[in-house]
Regions:
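Active-site rim elements
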Residues: 81-86, 190-196, 216-217
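Short hydrophobic-aromatic micro-motifs
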Residues: 21, 145-147, 206-208
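Catalytic core of non-heme Fe(II) oxygenases with the double-stranded beta-helix
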Residues: 95-98, 122-197, 237-245
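Glycine-rich nucleotide phosphate-binding loop and flanking beta-alpha elements
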Residues: 27, 134, 214
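A structural signal for short, well-ordered beta-strand segments
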Residues: 113, 145-147, 228-232
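Non-heme Fe(II)/2-oxoglutarate
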Residues: 43, 47-51, 62-65, 158-161, ...
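Non-heme Fe(II)-dependent double-stranded beta-helix
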Residues: 2-15, 22-128, 174, 243, ...
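Short, well-ordered beta-to-alpha junction loops that form the rim of enzyme active sites
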Residues: 24, 112-113, 164, 210-212
């Protein structure tokens, strides 16, 4: 990526709340990341989160139900394997984040920091939400980086985004008790109808703001979908003491 194109990408992100950077990671590197994830998935290597733990729509009702041991996320990706950590702190990520935040970036180990796995049949639907709902920092200015380890389409549960929603001042009554954006309100429905789902090829990366409304559908294909996801913030935007956001040491580049 040239500096000029980075600036254009960041401008798009500031305006829309997300931006797709095509082909940022080589297919060969993605294949390596996928092989590691498949092996760890097969081993059920801890720490992991099961679909049954969250009870999102379409998830098994319990770990004893059919599909009850379907994995949703391989947690603490940074600590799971050096290949994951190398991508999380890659020079191209540092350069992008420095340009966006205007200061040294930090990698949060408390949020995302996972290999997302979306399985056929038991992979759940994720409702509309802002990631910042459970995050506690001095400022609501964090950036998530979503690497498509394989192709992502509507058919296999790709992300949907509501453009420009990161700047919208939604009142609390627009969200339910779990802080999902309510789908039973006409005013919310009007926003949701503007949503787009960018089709991602292997190695494409989505940068999106923590206030951008997004969701993801079910995986209707016959293959597990893998996405490596990390979250970053500027060094001056510190997690609030005593909160989940401060529960794990952060990574300086």
């Amino acid at each position: 990526m040239s500096l000029h194109s980075k600036k254009e990408q960041i401008q798009t992100l500031r305006e829309q709340g997300f931006v797709v950077v095509p082909g940022l990671v080589s297919p060969e590197r993605c294949d390596e990341l996928k092989r590691i994830a498949q092996r760890q998935l097969q081993e059920a290597a801890a720490p992991i989160e099961f679909e049954a733990d969250l009870q999102y729509p379409g998830a098994p009702s319990s770990k004893d139900a059919p599909g009850g041991h379907t994995v949703r996320r391989l947690l603490d990706a940074y600590g799971r394997h050096p290949a994951f950590a190398q991508w999380a702190t890659a020079p191209e990520i540092r350069g992008w984040m420095e340009l966006y935040f205007g200061e040294e970036p930090r990698l949060s180990r408390a949020h995302h920091n996972c290999m997302m796995t979306k399985h056929p049949a038991y992979g759940s639907l994720t409702g509309w939400h802002r990631d910042v709902r459970y995050w506690s920092f001095e400022r609501d200015d964090l950036m998530s980086v979503w690497l498509a380890v394989g192709p992502e389409t509507v058919d296999n549960g790709a992300l949907w985004f509501v453009p420009q929603s990161h700047g919208a001042a939604f009142t609390s009554d627009r969200f339910d008790e779990a802080k999902f954006f309510r789908t039973d309100l006409a005013e919310n429905d009007a926003a949701i109808r503007t949503a787009v789902s960018p089709e991602l090829k292997t190695g494409d990366v989505v940068f999106f703001h923590c206030n951008t409304l997004h969701s993801a559908g079910k995986n209707l294909s016959d293959q597990v979908k893998f996405s490596l996801v990390f979250t970053y913030h500027g060094a001056s935007n510190v997690p609030l003491p005593g909160t989940r956001s401060a529960a794990k040491p952060e990574i300086a580049f």
